[in-house]
C-alpha cells in the first residue's frame, strides 16, 4: 500500500484516527484535499490519506486497515466491486449496485456503503431538476455508473437505458439491470454502445445523459462517447462524473448544443459530504468546502 499524500504531523493531536482512500491511479483525486479541509474546519481528530491500491493489493490493504484500526476508507477505481467481498455488511442500496465506495470500520466490523449514487442524484436535485418519472441514458457499467443508476431508480426514474461496450463489464451490466428491474419500479435496459442507432434514438427521446465512465478523464481528456454533437439537444440534461479536467469534452459538447450541464464537482462534493458524516458522525461543512475548493455556490 503506497501512501501518496504527505502529511504535516505536528498539526495533529496526540490521538487521532486515520481515514484512507484506496484506488489506482490516485494522484488525480481531490478527495484528500477536500476531506482534510473539512476535518480541519470541523476541528475533528482525523486525518485522511490516499493510498495506491489496485485489485491485487486490495485484500492486504483491508487487513492493514483493520490492523491500524483505521476509521474507514474511501474506495475508488478499480476496487469498488471487489470491495464488496471484503466487508461484513452491505446496505440495501450497495447490494443493488454491486459496488461500494465507502467502508466504515466499527471495531473490526466493516460496513460497506455507496455514496456515489446519492451524491450524483443529490447534485441533480440541487440544480432544480426533478428526476421523478424521467428517463436517463447512462454510459458505463462500473461502480460509479451503476451506483447512479440504482439511486436514480430508487428515487423515481422511470427508465434507464444503459450503454456499455461488450467488455468485462457487460455481463455485470446485465446482472445489475436484472437486480434493479426485480427490486424497483424503474425499467433498465442494456445495449452495446457500438449500436449507434440505438444510442442516437435514446438521446433523442430521453431527459438525462450521464457519463459514468472514465472517458474524459486524463489522459482521455480529448475523448467523448458522443461522436456526433447533433445528437444532443437543448432539452437534455448532461451530467458528468469526471472532474479532472473540470470541463470535459462531453460537457463542452453539451454546452455548445445548448444543454443544461452538471459537472463532476457536484458528485464529488455530495458523495464526500455523506462519507464525512458516516466516518465522523458530524455534519460536513458544505459551504466552507465549496468556497475553499472552488466548487461554486
Curated annotation (Swiss-Prot):
Its EC number is 1.1.1.282. InterPro entries: Aminoacid_DH-like_N_sf (IPR046346), NAD(P)-bd_dom_sf (IPR036291), Quinate/Shikimate_DH (IPR022872), SDH_C (IPR041121), Shikimate_DH-bd_N (IPR013708), Shikimate_DH_fam (IPR022893). Substrate binds at residues 80, 116. It catalyses: L-quinate + NAD(+) = 3-dehydroquinate + NADH + H(+); L-quinate + NADP(+) = 3-dehydroquinate + NADPH + H(+); shikimate + NADP(+) = 3-dehydroshikimate + NADPH + H(+); shikimate + NAD(+) = 3-dehydroshikimate + NADH + H(+). Pathway: Metabolic intermediate biosynthesis; chorismate biosynthesis; chorismate from D-erythrose 4-phosphate and phosphoenolpyruvate: step 4/7. Keywords: Amino-acid biosynthesis, Aromatic amino acid biosynthesis, NAD, NADP, Oxidoreductase. GO terms for molecular function: quinate 3-dehydrogenase (NAD+) activity; quinate 3-dehydrogenase (NADP+) activity; shikimate 3-dehydrogenase (NAD+) activity; shikimate 3-dehydrogenase (NADP+) activity. GO terms for biological process: amino acid biosynthetic process; aromatic amino acid family biosynthetic process; chorismate biosynthetic process; shikimate metabolic process. It holds the Pfam family Shikimate_dh_N. The keyword Manganese does not apply. Signal peptide: none annotated. NAD(+) binds at residues 141-144, 164-167, 214, 241-244, 264. Belongs to the shikimate dehydrogenase family. Homodimer. NCBIfam families: PRK12749.1. The actual biological function of YdiB remains unclear, nor is it known whether 3-dehydroshikimate or quinate represents the natural substrate. Catalyzes the reversible NAD-dependent reduction of both 3-dehydroshikimate (DHSA) and 3-dehydroquinate to yield shikimate (SA) and quinate, respectively. It can use both NAD or NADP for catalysis, however it has higher catalytic efficiency with NAD. This is Quinate/shikimate dehydrogenase. It comes from Shigella dysenteriae serotype 1 (strain Sd197).
Amino acid at each position: 500500500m503506497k501512501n501518496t499524500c504527505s502529511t504535516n504531523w505536528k498539526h495533529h493531536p496526540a490521538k487521532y484516527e486515520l481515514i484512507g482512500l484506496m484506488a489506482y491511479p490516485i494522484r488525480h483525486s481531490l478527495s484528500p484535499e477536500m476531506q482534510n479541509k473539512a476535518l480541519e474546519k470541523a476541528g475533528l481528530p482525523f486525518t485522511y490519506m490516499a493510498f495506491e491500491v489496485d485489485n491485487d493489493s486490495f485484500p492486504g490493504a483491508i487487513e492493514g486497515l483493520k490492523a491500524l484500526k483505521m476509521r474507514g476508507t474511501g474506495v475508488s477505481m478499480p476496487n469498488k466491486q471487489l470491495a464488496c467481498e471484503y466487508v461484513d455488511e452491505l446496505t440495501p442500496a450497495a447490494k443493488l449496485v454491486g459496488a461500494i465506495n465507502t467502508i466504515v470500520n466499527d471495531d473490526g466490523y466493516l460496513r460497506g456503503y455507496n455514496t456515489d449514487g446519492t451524491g450524483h442524484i443529490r447534485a441533480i436535485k440541487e440544480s432544480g431538476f426533478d428526476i421523478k418519472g424521467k428517463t436517463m441514458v447512462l454510459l458505463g457499467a462500473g461502480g460509479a455508473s451503476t451506483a447512479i443508476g440504482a439511486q436514480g431508480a430508487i428515487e423515481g426514474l422511470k427508465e434507464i437505458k444503459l450503454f456499455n461496450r461488450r467488455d468485462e463489464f457487460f455481463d455485470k451490466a446485465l446482472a445489475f439491470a436484472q437486480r434493479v428491474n426485480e427490486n424497483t419500479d424503474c425499467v433498465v435496459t442494456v445495449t452495446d454502445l457500438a449500436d449507434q442507432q440505438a444510442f442516437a434514438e435514446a438521446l433523442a427521446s430521453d431527459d438525462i445523459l450521464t457519463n459514468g465512465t472514465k472517458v474524459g478523464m486524463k489522459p482521455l481528456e480529448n475523448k467523448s462517447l458522443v461522436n456526433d454533437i447533433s445528437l444532443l439537444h437543448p432539452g437534455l440534461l448532461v451530467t458528468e462524473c469526471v472532474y479532472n479536467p473540470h470541463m470535459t469534452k462531453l460537457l463542452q459538447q453539451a454546452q455548445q448544443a445548448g444543454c443544461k450541464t452538471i459537472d463532476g464537482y457536484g458528485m464529488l462534493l455530495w458523495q464526500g459530504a455523506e462519507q464525512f458524516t458516516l466516518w465522523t458522525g458530524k455534519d460536513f461543512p458544505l459551504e466552507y468546502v465549496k468556497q475553499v475548493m472552488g466548487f461554486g455556490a
